Swiss-Prot record:
It is found in: Cytoplasm. It catalyses: Release of the N-terminal residue from a tripeptide. This is Peptidase T. One of its GO terms (biological process) is proteolysis. Zn(2+) 1 binds at H79, D142, D199. InterPro entries: ArgE/DapE_CS, Bact_exopeptidase_dim_dom, Peptidase_M20, Peptidase_M20_dimer, Peptidase_M20B. Its main location: cytoplasm. Keywords: Aminopeptidase, Cytoplasm, Hydrolase, Metal-binding, Metalloprotease, Protease, Zinc. Cleaves the N-terminal amino acid of tripeptides. NCBIfam families: peptidase-T, PRK05469.1, PRK13381.1. Pfam families: M20_dimer (PF07687), Peptidase_M20 (PF01546). The active site is at D81, E176.
Length: 410
């Protein structure tokens, strides 16, 4: 299993599937369709049935039931795209066997070092096989580890018919990282009663609570005048953006929050005297606090527009997804069965809120309750991203065990 996981994973991460928020097509980048087509071929090769990919890059496939019992159809999902934070082009995965617990030099020329001093959780991986970047790209374990684990689990079940299971559906979706994954996902065609995203982090993670999420695009329209004659005429759009940001609580940012604490996050700011554009994301687990945060953003925009004149501040505020706890708690047994599967494999479940979102958050509101299971990766979205091969083995085994337990309990 280890060899197959390593072979598939290192193949998938070399396909550049970074999504693009500025694109209006789906998938937003051609690399996602490239990987989708690769997976379609491989799904057919391992013996999956009803393998399809639509024009938008959504891959679906079926592993038929091999039991006479009436077992609910379950699904496993992972996303094709990688994050926009750092390039996913020319990913060169590095394999470090029997990790010694010390610094890993990812890139000598650029002096990029993965160090337990900065990332103390590395101590947990001593003796394991780590797959890292070369220090110039992200790795793409988010979520190609999940894709790999689903592929290997399905292949294992096909080759081990003695493990009884109901009908299993798998899906690989585009554009999750920019919040569009479920937009064109056909829940009815997928046909599962429950599903799981393999999109979590370290070993044991199990999540059924997510942020409420919104995005705020703000355009500041200034007035550029020659600085020599600018008195009482110039309006500096960049300074307007700075003034806007100064009114947001400094301690309510990602770098100062944890657990159930929400935040405002300035993703990007660019511009000049004439015009500046800022993009914020707004996150909170509590719905009332979420609404308050959006109201605060809107009130700052209104106050600045009143100060600088009509049309000086343009705000586009949109909800992205909601806390899926509300939809999963009524069927909490689907979380409990994963906990049982983990314990059967000597994994202690670590149930915590997702300080982020998965396709499952939106799918749960479309009628498909979808908790999130660990994929094994650490430090997602950056050059220090890595995954332990042994964690990928465990995630694969969890998929297999969940399928077995659903059949056993009927």
């Amino acid at each position: 299993m280890k060899e197959e996981l390593l072979k598939r994973f290192t193949k998938y991460v070399k396909v550049d599937t970074q999504s693009n928020e500025e694109s209006t097509v789906c998938p937003t980048t051609p690399g996602q369709m490239e990987l989708a087509n690769i997976l379609v071929t491989e799904l057919k090769e391992i013996g999956m049935q009803e393998v399809t990919v639509d024009e938008f890059g959504y891959v679906m496939a079926t592993l038929p039931s091999n039991t006479t019992k009436e077992v609910p159809v379950i699904g496993f999902l992972a996303h094709l795209d990688t994050a926009t934070d750092l390039t996913g082009k020319n990913v060169q995965p590095q394999v470090h066997e029997n990790y010694d617990g010390k610094d890993i030099v990812l890139n000598k020329d650029l002096n990029v070092v993965l160090s337990p001093k900065q990332f103390p959780e590395l101590a947990d991986y001593k003796g394991k096989t780590l797959i890292t970047t070369d220090g110039t790209t992200l790795l793409g374990a988010d979520d190609k580890a999940g894709i790999t684990e689903i592929m290997v689990a399905m292949n294992y079940l096909i080759n081990h018919p003695e493990i009884k299971h109901g009908k299993i559906r798998v899906a690989f979706t585009p554009d999750e990282e920019i919040g569009r994954g479920p937009e064109r996902f056909d829940v009815e065609a997928f046909g599962a009663k429950y599903a799981y995203t393999m999109d979590g982090g370290p070993l044991g993670e199990l999540e059924y609570e997510s942020f409420n999420a919104a995005g705020a695009k703000i355009t500041f329209n200034g007035n550029s005048v020659h600085p020599g004659t600018a008195k009482n005429k110039m309006v500096n759009a960049v300074k307007m953006a700075m003034e806007f940001n100064a009114r947001i609580p400094k301690d309510e940012a990602p770098e100062y929050t944890e657990g159930y604490e929400g935040f405002y996050h300035l993703i990007s700011l660019n511009g000049d005297v004439e015009q500046a554009k800022a993009y914020y994301i707004i996150r909170d687990f509590d719905h009332l606090k979420f609404v308050e945060r959006k109201t605060h953003i809107a009130s700052i925009a209104k106050e600045l527009e009143e100060k600088y004149g009509e049309g000086s501040v343009e705000l586009k505020l949109n909800d992205q997804y909601y806390n899926m706890r509300e939809k999963i708690e009524p069927v909490k047994e689907i979380v409990d069965i994963v906990s049982a599967a983990m314990r059967n494999l000597d994994i202690e479940p670590k149930i915590s809120p997702i300080r982020g979102g998965t396709d499952g958050a939106q799918l749960s509101y479309k009628g498909l309750p979808t908790p999130n299971i660990f994929g094994g990766g650490e430090n997602f979205h950056g050059k220090f991203e890595y995954v332990a091969l042994e964690s990928m083995v465990k995630a694969t085994e969890v998929i297999i065990e969940v399928a077995r337990l659903f059949e056993e309990k009927e």
